[in-house]
Each structure stands twice: as structure tokens, then as C-alpha cells.
């Protein structure tokens, strides 16, 4: 089972959007293989082509998302049933989606998306920004919650690093697994996330976005 495979372990997010230098399904598949060889237990990936390429290249469980913008909503991570259905054509064992309290495109209830995921025999992951959103996600039927959106909504704290308080509170008060994700820049951040009670953790930019890694080094030079 995908959840057991990532328990206590690192998931690496391999994503590059069209405006980024490494945008290529082939490159993302090689990035996933490199992550697997480094000891990653799972991969988080964006778009059907990337997920399919990664699934062919490595055997790790995949957390799948589709990022798409809509005019009537700020939500862009697996926002509608269209994106869910696209992901269900892939091998992604876990389907992640924005579960913030913001209005979804078309006003579709997030519960409908979760139900579709479960009907297909997959797991649903809630990308949240606050404890209340994580609590509601658990009640809605999500199989796990993540702290992905903390700092990316108008009403969540703006932090330089991970939202450790959110990770800790979710781990203490919720029954579903808590996935630490967002601004995990250093190995020490990862260690602390697990000390706060994270079930698993996702690291992206610090591993797979060379432009961000380079900028972090350049910043030190002033």
C-alpha cells in the first residue's frame, strides 16, 4: 500500500512548469530515477505526461496532481473533476488536491472529487494551509492531509521555512496521517518535521529545482 511505503520516509516532488528551464517529461522521469537512487520512497508529480513518464522509469508510489488555472477561483492544484479524471488515467496511487476553504472553480464541492478518487480505488490527499482546513479535510473523507498550502493563502502565516506548528498540531489532534510539505529547504527541516509528528514529508525545490538551489547559494553572497 502506498501509504505504508512512504511512512517515515521522504517523498521527492519532481515538477517543472512550462516557464521553467527543466520543463520536460523526460527530464522529470530522470529526476525521479535520481531521487529513487538517492533513497526517496515516493514521488510527487504534476501533469499526466510527467506522471506517465515517471511511472515507466521508476517503481515508487506516485502522488499525482494537475496544476491548472481557472478564472473564477484561486485554486489551481487539481481544482475540478476534469483534473481528477485525468489523473485517474495514470498510475498515481495518491491524488492530491487543494483542500483550502477557498471557492473551487464552478463551485463543485471537494467531497465530490474525493468520492471520485475513492470510487477508482485511489487515495485522496488534502493540500491545506491551516489546521481548520486539515480538520475539515479529515471529516470530508481525505485519507491524509498535507501542509502544502501554508503560506500560500491570504490567511495563513508567511514563514521562511516549514509550518512546524501546523505539522505538530495536526499530528497531535487528527487521526489521519500528516504529510509535511512546503519550504523544507534543508535536511534539518526534514528532521524537525518528523520530530513534530509528520507521517511522511515531501521535498521539492530544495532537491529538484536547480534555479532555486542556485539562488539560495547566490543570496549568501549578498
Q: Predicted regions span which residues?
A:
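Conserved N-terminal beta1-alpha1 strand-loop-helix module at the mouth
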Residues: 1-89, 124, 132-140, 144, ...
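A C-terminal functional module that forms or caps the active site or interfaces directly
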Residues: 165, 173, 177-178
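Glycine-rich beta-strand-to-loop/alpha-helix junction loops that act as flexible
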Residues: 179-184, 202-206
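Glycine-rich phosphate-binding active-site loops on the catalytic face of alpha/beta enzymes
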Residues: 15-17, 66-70, 90-104, 144-157, ...
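Conserved hydrophobic beta-strand within the GNAT/NAT acetyltransferase core sheet
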Residues: 97, 124-126, 178-181
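Solvent-exposed alpha-helices and their adjacent loops that cap or buttress functional pockets
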Residues: 1-5, 88-89, 116-118, 169-173, ...
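Glycine-enriched alpha-helix->loop->beta-strand junction motifs that scaffold or abut catalytic
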Residues: 39, 58-62, 90-94, 119-121, ...
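Active-site-adjacent beta->alpha loops and helix N-cap segments on the catalytic face
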Residues: 21-25, 44-63, 74-82, 99-117, ...
